Amino acid sequence: MPNNQNRDNFIDKAFTVIAESIVKIMPIADKEKKAYIYYRDGLAAQNNGDYSEALEYYKESLLLEENKIDRGETLKNMAIIYMSNGEEDLSIETYQKALVENPKQPSCLKNIGLIYEKRGRYAEQNGDLDQRDMWFDKAAQVWSKAVRLYPGGYLDIENWLKTSGRSSIDIYL
């Protein structure tokens, strides 16, 4: 029986072959096909941990992509890389750009909130309660939007909002 890594590689390769076949036969403009190919290559590089290569592919995709939802997804992936690299301000800025393109991305709001919450915990550890409250309030603000977009999807965040006293809503609908 193959190990999980071999199985995952097989699935990735099969998906790539299928996706390439679909892209070839789809009745879309060459520009859109190229944008998708750059996006796909960026995703593959990101999954392999080659973040600088992934960012280059994503940037090329953005130059060609016109679909706002696809642009938002590409920007979100770039923000994830920036967040992983510790570039929190650039990550927040890129998440915000993703939300301009596609405002219905609760994961962008969730991740912005994670950065704010982390900053609040750091301020708390340093005894700066005013800064802690400011960052926690900012986290609550974006997390409230996230759970409204994806009710029941972020139960840990809903619980944090309730237990921290930063939300009086019992159910986000």
UniProtKB/Swiss-Prot annotation:
Transmembrane segments: none annotated. It is found in: Cellular thylakoid membrane. Keywords: Membrane, Photosynthesis, Repeat, Thylakoid, TPR repeat. TPR repeats lie at residues 35-68, 72-105, 120-153. PROSITE patterns: TPR, TPR_REGION. Its main location: membrane. It is a peripheral membrane protein. One of its GO terms (cellular component) is plasma membrane-derived thylakoid membrane. It comes from the Bacteria. PANTHER family: CELLULOSE SYNTHASE OPERON PROTEIN C, TPR REPEAT-CONTAINING PROTEIN MJ0263. This is Photosystem I assembly protein Ycf3. The gene is ycf3.
